[in-house]
């Protein structure tokens, strides 16, 4: 089996990741180690948190908002209104809530386009307590750009709208972690929604001239995480 070192550089806004990894040219399915369901779950969770972190870093700043949308008694009753008598309550209510958040996103997109306002968001439908892992009352977490916040907030009529600015730091790993740990895992899905106008990370791959290369951050940067084959840093703004 032929192997050689490759370097991957991922640019997510002001956050840069520099990764060295061993690449195999003829790896077969038989070469891959079989993983337990728990190992697969943790691997998928790590991937989803990584991807959402990069998406947030690319598109949102400390000026933007982290929003929690709740359901009042009347709002929750509306979610259950059309539930068939024998249908399980939790899956039905969860799907009904997902329909409501998608309606809100579509409505906000329409009104923002009408007003000439850019609208960007990432959202999850949450019903898990991140501390106890028990079921929690259903709600939504949304990251919204500041320009669209006034319109977005005015369109939610099912309960309260709780807002705060996103964390004033370049790396939004903990925000992505907080959002996804409250979402039930569904195989084959990212478990978060987004508007289609979000920028994607820029990924560059190359074969390093020196396989023993030491990853060193530039001078005008703040190191977020550093290891032998992995470096994540934020470029300092002038």
Predicted regions and their residues:
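Right-hand nucleic-acid polymerase module
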Residues: 1-136, 146-238
